[in-house]
């Protein structure tokens, strides 16, 4: 793929339903590590950004040389906060980028396959789509 693509990993520190949810382990790795590994192993992204209000989460990203860590303010890191303000806050503070696409990798979707990511991005680019979203159907 010749396109420059950013992987944006939003990961809030506070969770009311499951404490430290994004740091929970599945096997030997936590959800942050799984998502970062998927982004890096896919070799799809020219830049991978971990955005969080939590120093503990950003510290996990520090283990990876190719990860850009971005601390977001508490005002956009609440239980009711959406992902879009975190993305806009990043770009407002980082004006030097040349990427053409942005892919949001939710930490709470650790079962994604790299092949699915590749197929998804390839499809979006080939169809010249401006927006794409993946969903999973619930089987009855």
Predicted regions and their residues:
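N-terminal nucleotide-binding beta1-loop-alpha1 segment
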Residues: 1-19
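Glycine-rich phosphate-binding loop signature in dinucleotide/nucleotide-binding domains
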Residues: 2, 93-100, 125-127
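Conserved acidic residues
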Residues: 5-6, 46, 67, 100, ...
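Short, well-formed alpha-helical segments that are part of the catalytic scaffolds
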Residues: 18-41
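Conserved SAM-binding loop
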Residues: 24-25, 50, 104
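Conserved N-terminal catalytic core of the sugar/cofactor nucleotidyltransferase
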Residues: 34-97
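Conserved core of the sugar-phosphate nucleotidyltransferase
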Residues: 80-86, 101, 107-140
């Amino acid at each position: 793929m010749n396109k420059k693509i950013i992987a944006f990993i939003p990961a809030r520190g506070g969770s009311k339903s499951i404490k430290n949810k994004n740091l929970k382990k599945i096997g030997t790795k936590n959800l942050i590590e799984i998502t970062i590994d998927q982004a890096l192993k896919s070799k799809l992204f020219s830049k991978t950004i971990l955005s969080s209000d939590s120093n503990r989460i950003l510290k996990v990203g520090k283990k990876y040389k190719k990860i850009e860590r971005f601390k977001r303010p508490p005002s956009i890191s609440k239980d009711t906060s959406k992902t879009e303000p975190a993305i806009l806050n990043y770009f407002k503070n980082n004006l030097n980028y040349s990427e053409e696409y942005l892919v949001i990798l939710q930490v709470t979707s650790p079962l994604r396959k790299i092949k699915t990511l590749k197929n998804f991005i390839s499809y979006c680019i080939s169809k010249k789509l401006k927006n794409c979203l993946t969903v999973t159907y619930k089987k009855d």
